[in-house]
């Protein structure tokens, strides 16, 4: 197994108290320079967004929060290589509230954070993750595309490494749809002391049931496609309600239904990301927020966050 980077080991929990100001008393410059979160950074960025850290996992929190897909962006992302430790740092530097993860098992039973079932798209290698050892997966060069900054240290991390990078800085959505090894997922969350800040996220009711048998205090996130499914799952989990309810982006009308039942809806906004990225038109973002989506999940936090913050933007623009 690849040794944890010294930066990661030294700085887990190093975020300090949330603050919207730097040492000079001024709000941080935004968007952040890549040197604050890439491989050249001497320390990971601290959580700076001026919001109570507990808001992310508090079902009664009414603020609009933003989740970074695969860290600071997936296939449409322009900030950092997806699903890497430094994509978590980038999400923190940008002021996101959550990062979404993609853990899947290797042949020797390690959980690596990789969206696809093969390494072909995002690395220099080829092959199915399930047939490769952790050492083989972590020896591959991550595809850096054209991300600005220094990514020479980027590699495919384990779930533990992602959780440690996030601890004290940002909350984590642990996607449980890519493996049946519920035990490994829960063990990683417990082992990294992230039970209060990692959400077990899946469309499988059975997996959530199994996870809660292992760790009854686990935070959860359900996924629903219809009002009937929403009603059924909320009844099933009445004794342990989900922290977040993810709705299908084909059914934004469910957002208000979720809210009317006292829950917070999360929805992917990838079509809006594509539209805003290509044309600069943010209409689709605005439509999602107007529909009642409280937690948009995005590949383009650089485009969505200013819209969510509006006149209350907690940072100084660098442009």
Regions of interest found by a model, annotated:
Residues 1-6:
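Sec-dependent signal peptide recognition
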Residues 13-16, 25-319:
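Phosphate-group recognition and catalysis centered on beta-loop-alpha active-site segments
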Residues 19-20:
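A structural motif detector for short, solvent-exposed N-terminal "entry" segments of globular domains
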């Amino acid at each position: 197994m690849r040794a944890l980077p010294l930066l990661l080991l030294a700085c887990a929990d190093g975020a300090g108290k949330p603050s919207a100001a730097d040492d000079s008393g001024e709000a941080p410059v935004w968007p952040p320079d890549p040197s604050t979160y890439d491989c050249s950074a001497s320390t990971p960025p601290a959580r700076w967004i001026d919001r109570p850290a507990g808001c992310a996992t508090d079902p009664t929190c009414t603020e609009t929060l933003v989740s970074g897909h695969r860290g600071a962006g997936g296939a449409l992302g322009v900030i950092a290589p997806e699903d890497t430790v430094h994509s978590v740092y980038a999400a923190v530097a940008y002021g996101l509230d959550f990062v979404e993860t993609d853990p899947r098992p290797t042949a020797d039973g390690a959980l690596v954070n990789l969206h696809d079932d093969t390494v072909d798209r995002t690395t220099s290698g080829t092959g199915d993750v399930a047939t490769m050892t952790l050492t083989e997966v972590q020896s591959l060069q991550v595809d850096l595309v054209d991300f600005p900054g220094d990514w020479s240290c980027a590699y495919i991390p384990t779930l533990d490494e992602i959780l440690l990078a996030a601890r004290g800085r940002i909350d984590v959505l642990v996607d449980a749809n890519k493996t049946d090894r519920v035990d490994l997922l829960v063990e990683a969350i417990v082992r990294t002391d992230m039970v209060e800040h990692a959400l077990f996220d899946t469309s499988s009711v059975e997996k959530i049931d199994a996870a809660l048998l292992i760790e009854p205090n686990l935070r959860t996130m359900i996924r629903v496609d219809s009002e009937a499914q929403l009603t059924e799952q909320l009844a099933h989990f009445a004794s342990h309600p989900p922290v977040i309810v993810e709705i299908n982006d084909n059914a934004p009308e469910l957002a208000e239904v979720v809210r009317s039942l006292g829950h917070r809806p999360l929805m992917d906004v990838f079509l809006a990301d594509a539209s805003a990225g290509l044309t600069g038109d943010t209409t689709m973002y605005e439509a999602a927020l107007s529909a009642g989506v409280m937690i948009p999940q995005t590949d383009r936090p650089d485009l969505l966050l200013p819209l969510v913050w509006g006149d209350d933007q907690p940072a100084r623009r660098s442009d």
